[in-house]
Amino acid sequence: MGATLVLVRHGQTEWSLAGRHTGRTDIELTTAGEATAKALAPALADVDFDLVLTSPRFRARRTAALAGFTEATVEDDLAEWDYGDYEGLTTPQIRESVPGWTIWDHPVPGGETPDEVGARLDRVVERVRATGGRVLVFAHGHSLRVLAARWLGLPVQDGRIFDLDTATYSVLGDDRGQPVVQRWNVGPTL
């Protein structure tokens, strides 16, 4: 049996609620974000994880702590996509100057390319697979979607097919050597 990777997207923030691209900006969870992060705890509490990792961003670290994982190891490679000049903007705002823009297909001035994000998350995949066990990660919408794509052997751009809400968990694993999605975008019960 291969490794199992449990992905948790951080709880809601004011910027995630507004659809603003939030990469480097370190912002707090909303009251609702704190509540849903706490509500994740029962779903994760009975699992014995071999490794627990978190993005260095406060919103991910706070979600980990509220879900009961105060000792999560910070992993810089789990940071959200660096949106460069588009930090804090919404997709409709960006499309005013770049019609049809998506993070998956267009350059991000002053930010990361899909290949750069993919390289970071490939290192996470390698680290998880090397454990051969259960690994829990707390991170962000775009970075987790890329991580899922790379786990499955798909191109970075295929991260676009994975919708991911805040304060949800997803489970990736292996079925007879084939990387698979076992659960996706499961929310806590409040």
Language model region names:
Residues A45-D48, V128-G133:
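Glycine-rich phosphate-binding loop signature in dinucleotide/nucleotide-binding domains
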Residues V6, T73-E75, Q182:
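General small-molecule cofactor/ligand-binding pocket signal
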Residues L5, T131-G141:
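Generic beta-sheet signal
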Residues G11, S55-R57, D77, L121, ...:
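Short, well-ordered beta-to-alpha junction loops that form the rim of enzyme active sites
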Residues M1-A3, V47, D82-P92, A149-L190:
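Acidic, low-complexity terminal tails and accessory targeting/binding regions
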Residues A39-T102:
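Phosphate-coordination/substrate-recognition cap region in phosphate-metabolizing enzymes
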Residues L5-T63, P109-D122:
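Loop-to-helix element that buttresses phosphate recognition and phosphoryl-transfer chemistry
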Residues E96-E116:
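Short glycine/proline- and acidic residue-enriched helix-loop micro-motifs
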